[in-house]
Curated annotation (Swiss-Prot):
It is found in: Cytoplasm. Transmembrane segments: none annotated. This is Phosphoribosylformylglycinamidine cyclo-ligase. Pfam families: AIRS (PF00586), AIRS_C (PF02769). It comes from the Bacteria. The gene is purM.
Length: 346
């Protein structure tokens, strides 16, 4: 039967080898609350140790999108898993939740044990950065659905927060200060446009350094998404945070309003933070308007937090002590949506 299955394109032995290879990476993510080991039908996590008055579970799921195609082109697979974790855990930490565990889903045309190991190595690194356990996953070999070199990657996370400490944004008022945490680069959104502008139309090479980039283009584009969990959880222990936004697809213009109550807008001060050279290269090569850039990309800011003005400097200092680059980038105002430099729309 194994030979028949192999002739159909599914290599069971390769699947077993991939699982064996990934175990050492997964083990590095374990928390004391994890029950059992790899290989069970489901992952188990003991919640009894959390002394919360009204515990609330917060879940999130996401993928890496077409950034995967850059990984295929560069044949580099050991960091794309960090992106998968980041996209999920950053989404739930903005609600005040501590990520507890993570599960991954890898679908591929052909199970290559070394490639699968590298993907899971990255996922495990992301979980360590976020402090969550990788308690399960699925690797599906699907010949005919994907080419032998292709795979898709998605993740799922669950976190916990005391109900009274959920960050909703509903108490944000005009005059609150917006603090931005620097991104590592493009993160994991907008890569369909990135490929069209830089690789298809611009015919740039992944191996060359362009303009003010410090790395070859391929390395720049594959920089992993920053994981903000630990600095944000430390911030929440020490200060009141009124709202947070993870700047993903839709950029500033779509994501900042997601944390704001009705009747409140955001005014952003352009020039108050450093926009990385990769965004300038994209805008120049693609002849993209500034509004389009801010409506697609994070433009150098991966997370925005809303705080009281009197707390802002202390919070910037705390975030900097946690290793983040943090800047005051604007404030909340009466109105709606996002404007720039004195209330102007881009």
């Amino acid at each position: 039967m194994a030979n028949a299955y192999k002739q159909a394109g599914v290599d069971i032995e390769a699947g077993y080898e991939a699982v064996s290879r990934m175990k050492k990476h997964v083990q590095t993510t374990m928390r004391k609350e994890v029950l059992g080991g790899l290989g069970g039908f489901g992952g188990m996590f003991d919640l009894s140790k959390f002394a919360l008055e009204e515990p609330v579970l917060v879940s999130g799921t996401d993928g890496v999108g077409t950034k995967l195609m850059l990984a295929f082109m560069a044949d580099k697979h050991d960091t794309i898993g960090i992106d998968a974790v980041a996209m999920c855990v950053n989404d739930i930490v903005v609600q005040g939740a501590e990520p507890l565990f993570f599960l991954d889903y890898i679908a591929c045309g052909k199970a290559e044990p070394s490639k699968i190991e590298n993907i899971v190595k990255g996922i495990s690194e992301g979980c360590r950065q976020a402090g969550c356990a990788l308690i399960g996953g699925e690797t599906a070999e699907m010949p005919g659905m994907y080419s032998t070199e292709e795979y898709d990657l998605a993740g799922f996370t669950v976190g916990i927060v005391d109900k009274k400490k959920i960050v909703t944004g509903e108490k944000i008022e005009a005059g609150h200060v917006l603090i931005g945490l620097a991104s590592s680069g493009i993160h994991s959104n907008g890569y369909s446009l990135v490929r069209k502008v830089l690789l298809e139309d611009g015919e740039l090479s992944l191996d060359r350094i362009y303009g003010r980039l410090e790395l070859p283009l391929g390395e720049e584009l594959l920089k992993p998404t920053k994981i903000y969990v630990k600095p944000i959880l430390e911030l929440l222990k020490n200060h009141e945070v009124y709202g947070m936004a993870h700047i993903t697809g839709g950029g500033f213009i779509e994501n900042i309003p997601r944390m704001l109550p009705e009747g409140i807008g955001a005014e952003i001060e352009l020039g108050s933070w450093k926009i990385q050279p990769i965004f300038s290269l994209l805008q120049e090569v693609g002849k993209l308007e500034e509004k389009e850039m801010f409506n697609i990309f994070n433009m150098g800011i991966g997370m925005v937090v809303a705080v009281k003005e009197e707390d802002a400097k202390d919070i910037v200092r705390l975030l900097e002590e946690q290793g983040e680059t943090a800047r005051i980038i604007g404030r909340t105002v009466k109105g709606a949506g996002v404007t720039f430099n004195g209330g102007k729309a881009l």
